[in-house]
């Protein structure tokens, strides 16, 4: 438990520092932050690297979206279908380039599809010790135009985490 809290605190510190300009670690420190995004805005993913350990903060948009045939996941205006904000391939390529074999944790800042989208793919591809995310509720979204496919992505994460035994 103490190790997980330390990891979470480290992730929080890295995240806070990322809002104050460029963060640079000494070459010998073994600590790096890798930012992956699309130039047009929207989808982001952050890989934290520390002495051979890896974690992620947000995972970017994925290729999956509901088609509206399931009443739990209605078609909504604003669901990204053009793939211009998808980070699945970039995240996968970057993790491979870094030699990642396992993720200590994935921290999702909020459950919009452009932050949670690739969690299920990562859980299916890599061993992950823990996923940190808030319980989803449409009530937290004050602008109905931003409901998108958030619940769909959230449910996919829960299903894949349960299948992989990740809490």
Residue ranges and their predicted role:
Residues 9-18:
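Bacterial N-terminal signal peptides
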Residues 1-9:
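Bacterial N-terminal signal peptides that target proteins for export
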């Amino acid at each position: 438990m103490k190790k997980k809290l330390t990891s979470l605190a480290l992730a929080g510190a890295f995240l806070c520092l990322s809002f104050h300009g460029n963060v640079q670690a000494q070459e010998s420190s073994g600590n790096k932050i890798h930012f992956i995004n699309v130039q047009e805005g929207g989808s982001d993913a952050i890989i934290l690297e520390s002495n051979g350990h890896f974690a992620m903060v947000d995972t970017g948009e994925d290729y999956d979206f509901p088609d509206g045939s399931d009443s739990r996941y209605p078609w909504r205006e604003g669901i990204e279908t053009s793939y211009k904000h998808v980070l699945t391939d970039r995240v996968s390529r970057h993790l491979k380039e870094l030699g990642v074999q396992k993720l200590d944790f994935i921290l999702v800042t909020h459950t919009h599809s452009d932050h949670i989208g690739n969690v299920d793919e990562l859980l299916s591809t890599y061993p992950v010790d823990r996923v940190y995310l808030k319980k989803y509720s449409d009530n937290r979204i004050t602008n109905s135009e931003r409901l998108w496919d958030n619940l769909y992505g959230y449910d996919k994460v829960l299903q894949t985490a349960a299948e992989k035994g990740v809490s």
